[in-house]
């Protein structure tokens, strides 16, 4: 340990002081509250001996939807941004290959697929946005949440979604919705609860724990537990910012961000089931073990026919 500390001190002393302008994901979701925000605001300054810091804010605080995030990064408005790959795929369809709706049904396989696709994403981020991709991570499984009006409904096949207005945020999810006869409606995550209240949408697609944290249980009755992906997400730096950093600062990020990425995947694995439990009848606890209210949604498991439809 002493040798490590001795070796690391010169690197810190050689660092140039820098404050980064950073955008995280949504303020009310746990990736920001427990990992993204703390990394930039607490861990980075500590690891760098105060040399590196960040003015880091969530999409929610900045009033951003997430769809525009890479354009702002390219313009140099921000130094680094966290985002969802399918939110930015309208500008670069190849990016969506990391998260095709319904193709992969388990998180382990999904992570391997994203890692395999990483080199393609790295190239696309650099060529399209002048950005350096430094992290890939996921969210709990993307499932359907619907206001069916009657909680006595205990079964609901995908064929019954015909004519329903369903919130989406990507082309691939929109294709799935159209494929089952629904009508895809693109709505930013932060605006979905009022959209469901007003009938602009009948159902929405999002992750299990994000749905709970965003209080979707206040406006929907059912959780249709068909997995349509895990919302592949990223951290990217503006390439000019990255290249302007001294080698000691770059080395710190390249050493520490893989650790943060691993924490993201571990949390996602835990939060998938936790979200389903919290949205339904429990048990429901936060990450520290404190009791939380349950959402009271009726869970509906996919039928064999529904599972087969995903493979078509």
Predicted features and spans:
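N-terminal secretory/targeting leader peptides
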Residues: 2, 6-109, 127, 132-312
């Amino acid at each position: 340990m002493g040798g490590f500390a001795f070796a690391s001190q010169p690197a810190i002393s050689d660092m140039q002081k820098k404050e980064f302008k950073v955008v995280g994901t949504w303020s009310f979701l746990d990736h920001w509250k427990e990992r993204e925000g703390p990394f930039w605001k607490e861990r980075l300054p500590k690891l760098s001996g105060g040399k590196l810091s960040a003015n880091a804010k969530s999409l929610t605080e900045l009033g951003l939807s997430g769809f525009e995030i890479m354009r702002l990064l390219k313009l140099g408005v921000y130094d680094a941004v966290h985002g969802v790959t399918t939110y930015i795929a309208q500008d670069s369809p190849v990016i969506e290959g990391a998260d095709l709706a319904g193709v992969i049904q388990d998180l382990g396989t999904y992570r391997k697929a994203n890692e395999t696709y990483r080199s393609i994403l790295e190239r696309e981020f650099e060529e399209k946005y002048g950005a350096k991709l430094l992290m890939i991570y996921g969210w709990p499984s993307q499932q359907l949440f619907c206001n069916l009006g009657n909680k006595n409904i205990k079964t609901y096949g995908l064929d019954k979604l015909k004519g329903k207005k369903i919130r989406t945020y990507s082309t691939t999810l929109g294709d799935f919705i159209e494929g089952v006869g629904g009508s895809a409606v693109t709505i930013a995550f932060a605006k979905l609860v009022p959209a469901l209240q007003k009938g602009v949408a009948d159902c929405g697609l999002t992750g299990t724990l994000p749905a709970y944290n965003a209080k979707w249980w206040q406006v929907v009755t059912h959780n249709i537990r068909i997995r349509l992906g895990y919302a592949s997400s990223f951290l990217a730096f503006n390439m000019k910012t990255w290249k302007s950093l001294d080698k000691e600062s770059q080395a710190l990020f390249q050493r520490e961000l893989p650790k943060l990425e691993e924490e993201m995947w571990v949390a996602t694995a835990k939060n998938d089931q936790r979200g389903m439990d919290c949205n339904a009848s429990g048990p429901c606890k936060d990450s520290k073990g404190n009791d939380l209210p349950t959402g009271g949604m009726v869970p509906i498991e996919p039928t064999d026919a529904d599972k087969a439809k995903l493979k078509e």
